[in-house]
C-alpha cells in the first residue's frame, strides 16, 4: 500500500515548522519533500496538522497474560494508537512472568497476533520477579526480550543486581529499574508528606527511591552496564542521577506526565485515581523533575500506563492498587500545560516523546527520514476537547485527569505503514 501525506508541517532540526509531504511505500518512508501524488496512491490531507514521528513510550503495563480484566495486548495497543504512540515497551509483571525463553516466545507471538502497534517486551531480571534467582538472559534475548527489569518491585539485594548488570552488559542489554527499598516503604500508599499526615495515611519517603538509585549507579559503574531509572520522582533521585552522569556512568532516566503535572498537594481527598507508585511527591520534587528534564538529567517521558478495573480502584486509598492509565492523554496534557503556556517548545516535547527514548536505548525509530519505518502521527494542535474516560480504548478508566480540557489531539496514527487510528476511530 502506498500513501502520500500532504500539506502537513514537520519540525526541522532547529524546531522550525516546515511544510513537507511524506510518501510511504509498504512499511517504510520512501520520500520526504514537495511531492505529487502518483497513480493509485492514497492521499492523506494533513492540512494544518503537525506531522510527528510516532510517539514512543518505553514503560507500559498491558497485563497479558493473567490480568486480562485490566488490559490486554490488543486493547493496550489500541489505546497507544489513539494516543499517537507507535512503539511501546511492555513491562513483565504479568502472570506468568516472561522469565523463560518459552514464555517470551509465547509473548512475542501474542504481540504479533494482536498488537496494532510495535510492542517491545521486557523480560524479568529474576524468576517470578522474586529477587532470588536470575533468569536466562541469553535465552530471553534470543527469544526477543527488549531489556531486563523486575518493574513493579525493586531488586532488593545488591549482589543480585550486580550479577544481573554484569550479565546484561555482556549481551549489550539494559537493566531497567523500579527503584524502591522495601524496608523503607512502611506500608505507604502516598508520599510521606503533608497529604499523608492530614489524612492519617502511611507515607512512602523520598529516600525509599533515592537510596536504591544511589546503590545502583555505583553497581552500574562497576559492571559497565546501561542502567535506566524508571519513573523518577524525587529531588534527591534527580541529584543522584545528575551526579552519576557527571561521573561518566551510563545511566538514563524517565519521568511520567503525572509526576510533571501533579504533586501531593493536588490530591482532592481520598481519590484513588491519584494513587500511583511512585506516589505524587511534594511541589518541590515536581520542580526538581522539571529542572532535571530541562538540563538533561532526565532523558525522556514515559507514561507508566497502568490500567486497573473500576472495582479495584473503588477500594480505600490504603487497599486500592497503585497506578493510572496514560497512553490516551499524555500528549494533549503535556502540550496544553507546557507548550501552550510557553514553558516548553514544541520541539522539546517532540524530542522527549520520540527522539530521546530511542537514542537512550539505541532504537531505530523516533525520526521521520527516508528509509525509516513508517511510524507517523498527525496531531491537531488547535483541537480542544475534554478528556472523557468513557471513550478510552484502554480497558482502564483510572485517570485523575477526567474532564480536563486539552489541546493537541492525535488525528491519525500510522504504525509500520498501516493506518491504525484515524479521525476518532480505529482503522481495520
UniProtKB/Swiss-Prot annotation:
GO molecular function terms attached to this record: allantoinase activity; dihydroorotase activity; zinc ion binding
Chain residues that bind Zn(2+) 1: 59, 61, 151, 304
Required co-factors: Zn(2+)
Family: Belongs to the metallo-dependent hydrolases superfamily. DHOase family. Class I DHOase subfamily.
Annotated binding of Zn(2+) 2, by residue: 151, 178, 231
SUPFAM superfamilies: Composite domain of metallo-dependent hydrolases, Metallo-dependent hydrolases
Keywords assigned: Hydrolase, Metal-binding, Pyrimidine biosynthesis, Zinc
HAMAP family: PyrC_classI_B
Species assigned in the record: Bacillus licheniformis (strain ATCC 14580 / DSM 13 / JCM 2505 / CCUG 7422 / NBRC 12200 / NCIMB 9375 / NCTC 10341 / NRRL NRS-1264 / Gibson 46)
Descriptive protein name: Dihydroorotase
Active site: residue positions: 304
Classification via Gene3D superfamilies: Metal-dependent hydrolases, Urease, subunit C, domain 1
List of residues binding substrate: 61-63, 93, 277, 308, 322-323
Gene Ontology cellular component list: cytoplasm
Cofactor note: Binds 2 Zn(2+) ions per subunit.
Amino acid at each position: 500500500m502506498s500513501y502520500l501525506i500532504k500539506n502537513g508541517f514537520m519540525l526541522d532540526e532547529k524546531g522550525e515548522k516546515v511544510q513537507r509531504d511524506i510518501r510511504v511505500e509498504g512499511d517504510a518512508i520512501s520520500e520526504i519533500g514537495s511531492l505529487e501524488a502518483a497513480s493509485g496512491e492514497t492521499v492523506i490531507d494533513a492540512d494544518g496538522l503537525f506531522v510527528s514521528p510516532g510517539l514512543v513510550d518505553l514503560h507500559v503495563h498491558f497485563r497479558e497474560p493473567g490480568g486480562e480484566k485490566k488490559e490486554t495486548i490488543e486493547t493496550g495497543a489500541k489505546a497507544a494508537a489513539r494516543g499517537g504512540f507507535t512503539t511501546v515497551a511492555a513491562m513483565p509483571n504479568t502472570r506468568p512472568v516472561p522469565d523463560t525463553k518459552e514464555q517470551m516466545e509465547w509473548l512475542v507471538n501474542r504481540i504479533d497476533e494482536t498488537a496494532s502497534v510495535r510492542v517491545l517486551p521486557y523480560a524479568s531480571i529474576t524468576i517470578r520477579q522474586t529477587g532470588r534467582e536470575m533468569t536466562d538472559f541469553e535465552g530471553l534475548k534470543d527469544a526477543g526480550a527488549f531489556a531486563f527489569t523486575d518493574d513493579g518491585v525493586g531488586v532488593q539485594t545488591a549482589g543480585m543486581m550486580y550479577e544481573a548488570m554484569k550479565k546484561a552488559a555482556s549481551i549489550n542489554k539494559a537493566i531497567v529499574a523500579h527503584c524502591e527499598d522495601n524496608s523503607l516503604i512502611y506500608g505507604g500508599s502516598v508520599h510521606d508528606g503533608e497529604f499523608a499526615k492530614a489524612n492519617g495515611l502511611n507515607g512512602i519517603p523520598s529516600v525509599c527511591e533515592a537510596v536504591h538509585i544511589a546503590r545502583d549507579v555505583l553497581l552500574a559503574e562497576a559492571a559497565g552496564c546501561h542502567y535506566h531509572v524508571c519513573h523518577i520522582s524525587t529531588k534527591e533521585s534527580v541529584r543522584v542521577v545528575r551526579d552519576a552522569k557527571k561521573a561518566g556512568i551510563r545511566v538514563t532516566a524517565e519521568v511520567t506526565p503525572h509526576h510533571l503535572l501533579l504533586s501531593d498537594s493536588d490530591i482532592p481527598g481520598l481519590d484513588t485515581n491519584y494513587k500511583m507508585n511512585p506516589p505524587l511527591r511534594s511541589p518541590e520534587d515536581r520542580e526538581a523533575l522539571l529542572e532535571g528534564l530541562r538540563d538533561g538529567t532526565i532523558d525522556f517521558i514515559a507514561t507508566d500506563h497502568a490500567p486497573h478495573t473500576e472495582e479495584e480502584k473503588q477500594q480505600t486509598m490504603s487497599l486500592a492498587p497503585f497506578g493510572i492509565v496514560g497512553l490516551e492523554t499524555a500528549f494533549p496534557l503535556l502540550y496544553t500545560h507546557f507548550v501552550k503556556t510557553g514553558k516548553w517548545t514544541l520541539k522539546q516535547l517532540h524530542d522527549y516523546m520520540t527522539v530521546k527514548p530511542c537514542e537512550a536505548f539505541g532504537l531505530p525509530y523516533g525520526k521521520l527520514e527516508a528509509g525509516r519505518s513508517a511510524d507517523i502521527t498527525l496531531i491537531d494542535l488547535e483541537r480542544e476537547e475534554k478528556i472523557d474516560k468513557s471513550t478510552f480504548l484502554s480497558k482502564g478508566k483510572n485517570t485523575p485527569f477526567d474532564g480536563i480540557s486539552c489541546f493537541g489531539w492525535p488525528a491519525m496514527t500510522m504504525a509500520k505503514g498501516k493506518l491504525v487510528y484515524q479521525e476518532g476511530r480505529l482503522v481495520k
